[in-house]
Amino acid sequence: ESNTAIAHFATGKSDASGISAEDFEWVKRAQGTYDFTIYNRGPSASVNFFWFNQNAGISEEGRPYLPKHKLEWFTDKRFRQAILHGFNREGLIDAILFGKGEVLHSIIPPAKGEWHNPNVRKYDYSIAKAKALLQSAGFYWDSDRTLKDRNGEPVRFNLLLVESDRYDQIGVTFV
């Protein structure tokens, strides 16, 4: 648990500790009270990312892993690009990481050195680009502003979040 690790570090029970973004300000203030020094070791090698299930297979129970319409969405490059353009990474970094992060455009961060490719395609936050890509893929908005695919299926999908309790702390609920 993060709180225990930080407490052990601050009181000298451990010699080193990683600091999460949410603990950074407390640790920075505690530096004057406890006998330790914070060293900036540079960018983290960890990343947070999501991907879409594109498994067209059938489960052992004989059911498809995905409904056909969702498989069509997730395998359409324009749909995925639209999601990337509609994703406010800076806003997420500010809200979840308290500004202690950087926007990445690959699952390989700069801290990984020679394996990082800074020349990958970048998808800036642009609602206009996202909407244009969705429309080019046959999606549309009905009179209630619900996004639907070309067959009239509302666009809804689940996100599985490993650290969903962190989002709960700020009042964000994913279903």
Regions found by a protein language model. Give the residues of each.
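Extracytoplasmic/periplasmic ligand-capture domains
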Residues: 1-98, 102, 111-175
